Amino acid sequence: MGVEKMVCLASRTGRQFQRYNKGRRQVVGCVPYRFKLSNDGKISDEVEVLVISSQKGHALMFPKGGWELDESVEEAASRECLEEAGVLGNVEHQLGKWDFLSKSRGTYYEGLMFPMLVTEQLELWPEQHVRQRIWMNVTEAREACRDWWMKEALDVLVERLSSPMNQPKEEKTMSISIETMC
């Protein structure tokens, strides 16, 4: 008899434990990606990325949310992918940092984005009833993504993955277990 993974099905809420830098809320997110399988079951060079719907369902984006005081930036990025997209994987070296204007709050935020090489897609996840998740090729995702700064993060990832110097084994990665996020 196998042991199944237990997933905390509640997302963190509230802003009281959020990190700020010079008055700007710090948010972290990931561009979850995987290499597409060919018809014969082999891994191809084609990359797919996972986008999610906003909670109101009107826009597509990459998972992101507040960076809290009790976690590293990589843990926050991994937690957001679990909560919003229901995926686990290896958080890789930061893609960049962007200052952007929040459409809903009218204030500037600081966004840090990471690539996540997805290793597992869960059937149940905390925000499954308020978000859709869709795997797309890079071109489709770039067109569909609402936020300019997330499109730029996607461009950085594509450039990094297409670089002949790209050596995934040497890339700094961090895997976070589900237990540390609940």
UniProtKB/Swiss-Prot annotation:
<comment type="similarity">
    <text>Belongs to the Nudix hydrolase family.</text>
</comment>
<keyword id="KW-0809">Transit peptide</keyword>
<keyword id="KW-0496">Mitochondrion</keyword>
<keyword id="KW-0479">Metal-binding</keyword>
<dbReference type="GO" id="GO:0005739">
    <property type="term" value="C:mitochondrion"/>
</dbReference>
<keyword id="KW-0460">Magnesium</keyword>
<feature type="binding site">
    <location>
        <position position="84"/>
    </location>
    <ligand>
        <name>Mg(2+)</name>
    </ligand>
</feature>
<keyword id="KW-0378">Hydrolase</keyword>
<keyword id="KW-0464">Manganese</keyword>
<dbReference type="InterPro" id="IPR047198">
    <property type="entry name" value="DDP-like_NUDIX"/>
</dbReference>
<dbReference type="GO" id="GO:0046872">
    <property type="term" value="F:metal ion binding"/>
</dbReference>
<dbReference type="GO" id="GO:0016462">
    <property type="term" value="F:pyrophosphatase activity"/>
</dbReference>
<dbReference type="Pfam" id="PF00293">
    <property type="entry name" value="NUDIX"/>
</dbReference>
<dbReference type="InterPro" id="IPR015797">
    <property type="entry name" value="NUDIX_hydrolase-like_dom_sf"/>
</dbReference>
<dbReference type="InterPro" id="IPR000086">
    <property type="entry name" value="NUDIX_hydrolase_dom"/>
</dbReference>
<comment type="function">
    <text>Probably mediates the hydrolysis of some nucleoside diphosphate derivatives.</text>
</comment>
<feature type="transit peptide" description="Mitochondrion">
    <location>
        <begin position="1"/>
        <end position="26"/>
    </location>
</feature>
<feature type="domain" description="Nudix hydrolase">
    <location>
        <begin position="27"/>
        <end position="158"/>
    </location>
</feature>
<feature type="binding site">
    <location>
        <position position="80"/>
    </location>
    <ligand>
        <name>Mg(2+)</name>
    </ligand>
</feature>
<feature type="short sequence motif" description="Nudix box">
    <location>
        <begin position="65"/>
        <end position="86"/>
    </location>
</feature>
<protein>
    <recommendedName>
        <fullName>Nudix hydrolase 17, mitochondrial</fullName>
        <ecNumber>3.6.1.-</ecNumber>
    </recommendedName>
</protein>
